[in-house]
């Protein structure tokens, strides 16, 4: 199968496209946080896509962005590390949300094309200039397109001379039907993370079985975090509709993607399946938080297959 890589203008940015001859494609903007603009299989878009540069910059619902150095919400936007308190800007109610990686200007390190796949590798180096996270690190993201499949590998290397707290995540919105009500969902064995009125964890978890088997979403509203409890190396989420079957997966294990956020936005046209290496507010509650030593790398993979 023939794969190719092309580059085109996209407003003030460039959009890079990896595609093959059967209509599989991933399209991203490295200069805007390596945000995924669209993902297609056999010509069918399965992502809530960005159609214009203006829509990308508006960034409604944080569609398809990478999340670092923490995913999800941070209580009051503050945390304490090695006796010093740091303050992020408040940008979600009384909390900070999703870190600061969404629009950083990444560099394309390399593009690799083979008979079986196309991969683009983007990186961004932080020299410690962020007031709330004054640590040096290198973030990397590899996106690989294969035959009816797409894989992401994130990496975060501590370039500083002290240990630093790290959490990673991704925020894709999938579209599998005109209405989310008509999608069938199956989730991995997991616990429901109980939250308070500020959408922050209470410290309690409950067993969750609503989508143990393929079940129509219907009128269910979801904006919930889950701790994946199954003992295996991979967790799987299935989305099925008249358009086909989307099989999402994420690596499990120590320092991998043991948490998952599932969100159905109010417009009810898509569903977000969000891998996280740590819990909501992990900089404060420490759940799943990785303290990365100098030169240590946190990495992990997730992806989708379509049939």
Across the structure, where does each feature detected by a protein language model lie?
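Beta-strand-rich N-terminal accessory domains
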Residues: 1-86, 90, 232-254, 298-306
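Intrinsically disordered, low-complexity Pro/Gly/Ser/Thr-rich segments with frequent PxxP/GP/PP motifs
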Residues: 288-297
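Extended, loop-rich substrate-binding clefts of extracytoplasmic carbohydrate-active enzymes
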Residues: 2-10, 89-146
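A short, structured loop/turn motif at beta-sheet edges
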Residues: 80-84, 109-120, 144-149, 177-182, ...
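Acidic, contiguous internal or C-terminal segments within carbohydrate-active enzymes
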Residues: 30, 128-166, 170-172, 177
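C-terminal or internal capping secondary-structure element at the end of a domain, subdomain, or sheet
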Residues: 141, 149-151, 296-307
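Active-site/ligand-binding surface loops and adjacent short beta/alpha elements
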Residues: 2, 86-88, 163-165, 173-250
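Acidic/His-leaning functional-site neighborhoods
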Residues: 96-111, 216-288
